[in-house]
């Protein structure tokens, strides 16, 4: 058995990636979220495949095909709600995974970090297109509003939007192409995940201390496989609670009304995991400025390795930087809440303040605090 595991051309790749992989002996539960993201991706692909068997990407039948899945297909409602709430769990794990990378300085592994940012953008694009497919009111108007943002691009904006729409408004052509992209992107994400892991295994994993872990490593199996299984169990628990007890908790009631181009919902908003970026977009009165701020709110992650001024990689022994990190987390909570509120006083002011704070913390406060801590440690 050992010979097959170590000599077979395919199995030995699996062996060196998940069984005999030397892993740092001190990585905490914050490192579980990578494997949980893999589990979420697998769940989304499997449930999505079964949903695609019954879904029709046509404006006249899309809404009723989703209703048909829930009412007539055996356990169709379970598959549908596992897919919808699985996306929420996916993003929850994704945000924690990125947060852990920021806190413990994993961004110094630049190739892994940059592929991670590309993955984040791809997953966000996939989730956005998936939200359009049920063809409810919020699906239609969300698609209209978000795709329309591209019209802010000078010269080519209007042509670009009409090219994406496949006409002069969000219609059948838009729905069909969104379904096609929503189906293919998870497989592209899977390929990117493999590249992400390839780069990670080139350098080895970071650890909570932010120091080289070469002197003290343990095999991935059985230690971290058991640990990841426990994490998976703890993820399944809230997911199943959501699916079976309140499947529509994170959804929008407007999406149970079929799409109607002649009736605008009183408050157009995306799913909860996009609300922080949506709040930043809305906080700037200028359309192009808002779109740039929206993109930069995610793209800013790419320049974080350049902003690292502290001599210590991890924040574990930097209490002042820890304070700023948790202020950033609180700020993102605030932006998420603001994104779901109507555009009126005092929400506009709170949103603008939180948006300024978000960029200030990352671009100015954290690098400055790194320098201050170096001085305090006489480095």
From Swiss-Prot:
Family membership: Belongs to the cytochrome b family.
Record bears the keyword Secreted: no
Chain sites annotated for binding heme b b562: 83, 182
Superkingdom assignment: Eukaryota
Cofactor note (record): Binds 2 heme b groups non-covalently.
Subcellular location(s) of the protein: Mitochondrion inner membrane
Gene3D superfamilies linked to this entry: Cytochrome Bc1 Complex, Chain C
Keyword Oxidoreductase: no
Protein name: Cytochrome b
GO-annotated biological processes: mitochondrial electron transport, ubiquinol to cytochrome c
CDD domains associated with the record: cytochrome_b_C (cd00290), Cytochrome_b_N (cd00284)
Organism the protein comes from: Propithecus diadema diadema
Residues reported in the UniProt entry to bind a ubiquinone: 201
GO cellular component: mitochondrial inner membrane; respiratory chain complex III
Keywords from the UniProt entry: Electron transport, Heme, Iron, Membrane, Metal-binding, Mitochondrion, Mitochondrion inner membrane, Respiratory chain, Transmembrane, Transmembrane helix, Transport, Ubiquinone
Pfam families xrefs: Cytochrom_B_C (PF00032), Cytochrome_B (PF00033)
Cofactor(s) essential for the protein: heme b
Gene Ontology molecular function: metal ion binding; ubiquinol-cytochrome-c reductase activity
């Amino acid at each position: 058995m050992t010979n097959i595991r170590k000599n077979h051309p395919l199995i030995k790749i699996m062996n060196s990636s998940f069984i005999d992989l030397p892993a740092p002996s001190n990585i905490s539960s914050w490192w579980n979220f990578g494997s949980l993201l893999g589990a979420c991706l697998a769940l989304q692909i499997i449930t999505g495949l079964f949903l695609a068997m019954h879904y029709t990407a046509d404006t006249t039948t899309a809404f009723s095909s989703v209703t048909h899945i829930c009412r007539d297909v055996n356990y169709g409602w379970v598959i549908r709600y596992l897919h919808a709430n699985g996306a929420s769990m996916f993003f929850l794990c994704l945000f924690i995974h990125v947060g852990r990378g920021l806190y413990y300085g994993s961004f110094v592994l630049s190739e892994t970090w940059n592929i991670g940012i590309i993955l984040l953008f791809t997953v966000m694009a996939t989730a956005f297109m998936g939200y359009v497919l049920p063809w409810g009111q919020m699906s239609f108007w969300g698609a209209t509003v978000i795709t329309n943002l591209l019209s802010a691009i000078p010269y080519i904006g209007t042509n670009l939007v009409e090219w994406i729409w496949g006409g002069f408004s969000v219609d059948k052509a838009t729905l069909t192409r969104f379904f096609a992209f929503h189906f293919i992107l998870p497989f592209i994400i899977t390929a990117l995940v493999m590249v992400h892991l390839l780069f990670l295994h080139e350098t080895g994993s970071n650890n909570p201390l932010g120091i080289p872990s070469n002197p003290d490593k343990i095999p991935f199996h059985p230690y971290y496989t058991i640990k990841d299984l426990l994490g998976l169990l703890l993820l399944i628990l809230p997911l199943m609670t959501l699916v079976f007890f309140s499947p529509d908790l994170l959804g929008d009631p407007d999406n149970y009304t079929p799409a109607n181009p002649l009736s605008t919902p009183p408050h157009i908003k995306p799913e909860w995991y996009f609300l922080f970026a949506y709040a930043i977009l809305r906080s700037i009165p200028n359309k192009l400025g808002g779109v740039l701020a929206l993109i930069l709110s995610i793209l800013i992650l790419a320049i974080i390795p350049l902003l690292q001024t502290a001599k210590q990689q991890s924040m574990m022994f930097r209490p002042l930087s820890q304070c700023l990190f948790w202020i950033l987390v609180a700020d993102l909570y605030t932006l998420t809440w603001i994104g779901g509120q109507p555009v009126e006083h005092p929400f506009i002011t709170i949103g603008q303040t939180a948006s300024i704070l978000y960029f200030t913390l990352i671009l100015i406060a954290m690098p400055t605090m790194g320098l201050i801590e170096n001085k305090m440690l006489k480095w």
